[in-house]
Regions:
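Active-site microenvironment of metallo-dependent hydrolases
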Residues: 1-44, 52, 93-95, 276-292, ...
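Active-site neighborhood of phospho(di)ester-bond hydrolases with catalytic His/Asp-centered motifs
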Residues: 68-74, 102-105, 133, 168-170, ...
Length: 572
């Protein structure tokens, strides 16, 4: 804050001059104590001057309404929304989100440091504060092929950027626990004193070793017991509610008045249709309160706790000297803000956004570098008398299970089996590195005919296709190759629906309405082809390639047993 600004703030705080804006008569949430108090919020420029009784050049009556700090998302991947950052900003601001902490490892897996720099550029000078944690695992493991390999040396020039706060989720937890040199190099990056964690199911001495490396948070807990152990060992707990990982209600029983201040809320990977229809962090608060959890604790998690976890001491509370990032709600049941201020400026009024996002600063480059896609690549010779490892989908989770099944075969080759819901799954390397193709089997999609394809395939984002028919699988793969990446549904040899994602094969260059319309078409066709209502087909598909979440995955290099952290044969 400049001295001249501080002089004005202090004069208004003393009540000697009118504030620029005063929110009058609201029920104000105190993030420090969890209390509510009736009063005014006085704002000068970007700063809160005081709480109490004030007059202002502009006064906004919020009597009977609930006033809170702007909400924060402690961990998300912008790319997972499938819209560009500036388009996402519009959605988040409408939901009262004023600060986010993003890990751009999706685009970094495709474009390397150029992708991180693009995200930094695209989030400059917008009314949403976007901070970044540098991707720590590109690729996530050596058991897949990404578009680049990010070493500590490549990341170091980005450390000094003012919106880079540390190192993103350390997914290579075996490498961390066992002190792998490349992992330790990244943990030692100058300036990266904060490091987010990713340790699904890690406990006991392995958890001790993981956290002793300097990692200080985790968002992968799925049970209250796991959450409590991580809290006891000093990690910040980020309670996640994502499109494919619904963990919030399972974790909230671990939150108590004594440990609440070490807890934050996170959306991780949340799809656009759910952001638009349900919301973001505000929706997580709504879920929690609807199930009887104290709104005060949930608000602390979404504001002050998150700010303090990332050592940002200028936000997260309605108090003198803090940023004037503010939400006003009609009630504590429906958390859709009626008024949102960002840096002291009204940005949302009566659920209408008062900001127009500028266009993309850079035209997308083609990132689809596949070699020829051929039917022969999909062939799996049957191994008589041997069972195959099959990836089993767990509904509403990104975890998978491993099954051992005698697959259906025709003419000596494995084929999809709709009666037992066992489908063929393929991953094509798309970065132009080696032309690999991995082929496996998956159970739980419910698909009765056709094929689904996606270049959103965590974390290396190769091309993944699941299908009943090899020819439809090939048609879907070729369609996305020609489109520059995206999502596609194919049946009877025809593309039934497609969403092009020309930004690294991950994000659209179109507006929310366009993307939403295309997603609705895709969802319609997945249902038509048999996918049950409780399976988010494309979100589920996108995580079947992630070799750091138990238990069985498929990469371009083959089947990955995450427990063994090794490539395994299809046949037992």
């Amino acid at each position: 804050m400049k001295n001249i600004d501080l002089t004005e703030v202090l004069a208004a705080a003393r009540g000697e001059v009118p504030a620029d804006i005063v929110l009058k008569g609201g029920c104000i949430f105190n993030s420090f104590t969890g209390e509510w108090e009736i009063g005014d919020v006085a704002i000068v420029g970007e700063t809160i001057a005081g709480i109490g009784s004030y007059s202002g050049k502009k006064e906004i009556d919020v009597t009977g309404k609930y006033v809170t700090p702007g909400l924060m998302d402690s961990h998300l991947h912008i790319e997972s929304t499938m819209v560009a950052p500036r388009e996402l900003a519009k959605i988040l601001l409408l939901n009262g989100i004023t600060t986010i902490f993003a890990d751009p490892h999706e685009i970094a897996n495709v474009l390397g440091t150029a992708g991180i720099e693009l995200m930094l550029t695209e989030t400059e000078a917008i009314p949403l504060d976007v901070f970044f944690m540098l991707p720590s695992c590109v690729p996530a493991t050596e058991m897949e092929t990404s578009g680049t390999v990010l070493t500590a040396a490549k990341l170091e020039p980005l450390v000094s950027h003012p919106r880079v706060l540390g190192l993103g989720e350390m997914m290579n937890y075996p490498g961390t626990i066992n002190a792998a040199a490349a992992v330790l190099d990244k943990l030692a990056l100058a300036g990266c004193s904060l490091c987010d964690g990713h340790a699904p199911g890690v406990s006991g001495k392995a958890l001790n070793a993981y956290l002793a490396a300097g990692i200080s948070s985790d968002h992968e807990a799925t049970t209250a017991d796991e959450a409590m152990e991580k809290l006891r060992r000093g990690a910040y707990l980020m309670l996640r509610e994502a499109s494919g990982a619904h963990n919030l209600l399972a974790l909230l029983p671990a939150v108590t008045p004594l440990n609440c201040r070490r807890c934050c809320l996170a959306t991780d990977d949340r799809h656009l249709d759910e952001l638009v229809s349900e919301g973001s962090i505000n929706y997580l608060i709504e879920i929690g309160t609807a199930h009887g959890y104290p709104v005060e604790q949930l608000l602390q998690m979404a504001t002050l706790n998150t700010a303090e976890r990332f050592r940002l001491y200028d936000r997260g509370a309605l108090a003198p000297g803090y940023k004037a990032d503010i939400c006003v709600f009609n009630n504590l049941v429906n958390f859709q803000p009626q008024l949102v201020l960002k840096n002291g400026v009204v940005i949302v009024n009566k659920q209408k956004l008062l900001w127009q996002s500028p266009p993309l600063l850079k035209d997308p480059e083609n990132t689809m570098h596949l070699e020829d896609v051929r039917e022969q690549q999909l062939r799996l010779p049957v191994m008589n008398g041997r069972k195959a490892r099959v990836i089993r989908i767990v509904p509403e989770q990104i975890l998978t299970e491993t099954e051992y099944v005698q697959p259906k075969a025709e003419a000596g080759f494995v084929v999809s089996d709709t009666e037992r819901d066992i489908l063929k799954l393929a991953v094509w390397e798309r970065h132009g590195s080696n032309g690999n193709t991995g082929v496996g089997l998956v159970r739980g999609f419910g698909l009765q005919r056709g094929a689904l394809a996606s270049t959103v395939a965590h974390d290396s984002h190769n091309l993944i296709v699941v299908g009943v028919d090899d020819q439809d699988m090939l048609t879907a793969a070729v369609a996305l190759q020609e489109a520059g990446g995206g999502l596609a549904v194919v049946a009877d040899g025809e593309v039934k629906a497609m969403l092009p994602l020309p930004l690294a094969g991950l994000m659209s260059d179109q507006n929310t309405e366009f993307v939403q319309h295309k997603l609705q078409q895709l969802n319609f066709w997945t249902a038509e082809l048999g996918v049950p209502e409780n399976v988010n087909a494309f979100n589920c598909l996108s995580f079947l390639t992630l070799p750091v979440i138990p238990s069985l995955r498929l990469s371009d290099k083959g089947l990955v047993d995450v427990g063994k952290f090794a490539i395994v044969d299809l046949w037992e």
